[in-house]
Amino acid sequence: MRKSTTHSLIALGALLALTAQSPAPAATPAAQSWCTRLPLPRPDLPAMKVEGNPVHRGRAAECRVLEVRAGRTMLRLAVAATNAQREHGLMNVPFVPAGQGMLFAFPGGDELRGFWMKDTITPLDMVFVRSDGTIMMIAENVPATKPGTPDDKIARRQALAKYVIELGARESERIGLQPGMQLYIEAVDAK
């Protein structure tokens, strides 16, 4: 009896030591996405890594956070710079905090970029931005998609752009974004 109690206490102590060293669940992105757990980490901290991410077929994935100046407002945006990241976007993200969102960066220059709200469960603003940082168009309050919505009923928007920024619904109006406004976006190596 005494031996099993001692072994149980040792095992419990080891478990507690391991738990104390593990990061808190809120400090890591959601397992189903590479970088869509919001709010985003501060951009001056190292990129977060997620092991076993299904979007990246088991490889570690990085979440790059970029600050983009929009007038007097600084936005903190997760960067989607690969096809897999752009394809996943903000799917299944229940809430986008004020001043945060996602920057979709594309290779090449300004082209017609089409977006849809497949599996996007919160309404969004889509800000289409040219390669020189000029806002071309803002699609405000694009409706969320309910589970089971047929593809032909899912909201879609498109415009000429190199970058597309997704923000929470009505956020572009709140911070004063307008077509023709200049944003300051650091170069992104899009693939």
Regions found by a protein language model. Give the residues of each.
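Bacterial N-terminal signal peptides that target proteins for export
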Residues: R2-A11
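Hydrophobic helical h-region of N-terminal Sec-dependent signal peptides
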Residues: I10-L18
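Cleavable N-terminal signal peptides
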Residues: G13-A14, A24, G58
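Boundary at the C-terminal end of the N-terminal hydrophobic targeting segment
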Residues: A20, A24-A26
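Compact, glycine-rich, soluble single-domain proteins
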Residues: A27-K191
